[in-house]
Amino acid sequence: MSQGSRPTSSDIAVNQRECVKVEGFKVVSTRLRSAEYESFSHQARLLGLSDSMAIRVAVRRIGGFLEIDAETRHRMEAILQSIGTLSSNIAALLSAYAENPTMDLEALRAERIAFGKSFADLDGLLRSILSVSRRRIDGCSLLKDAL
């Protein structure tokens, strides 16, 4: 392109490609029929995702990468909040017991049991989230089912 002339669309495309390159990423493109694209794009919008993000989620899921859905995230937050509450309750009971050692320990025992249950729930949830082999199998099953 000479000085003073206007850039062509191919010049702009080349300049954009040069600016967009980010280390560690690969650009993947695919051809979809109009109906496929419309259906896919509609589903992505219903979930509040861009087309690019929806494709990335699908690829990551097929590859077995970690994706946590909103329901799982809410369950985890609820368990963590429960653990925090139980921890405070146990500390208060222990403090009360230190002041008055004759009090009944049944309340402390019940809180400790609930605390253990919450930790077991959290452990189970984390194991299911972090199971790489299960995530890969789930993602590959989605891909195979689509074929």
From Swiss-Prot:
One example of a Gene Ontology biological process annotation: import into nucleus
Enzyme Commission number(s): 3.1.-.-
InterPro entries, per database record: VirD1
Keywords per UniProt: Crown gall tumor, Endonuclease, Hydrolase, Nuclease, Plasmid
GO molecular function: DNA binding; endonuclease activity
Functional summary from the UniProt entry: Tumor formation by A.tumefaciens involves the transfer and integration of a defined segment (T-DNA) of Ti plasmid DNA into the plant nuclear genome. The virD operon encodes a site-specific endonuclease that cleaves at a unique site within both 24 bp direct repeats flanking the T-DNA.
Protein name according to UniProt: T-DNA border endonuclease VirD1
Record lineage: Bacteria, Pseudomonadati, Pseudomonadota, Alphaproteobacteria, Hyphomicrobiales
Gene: virD1
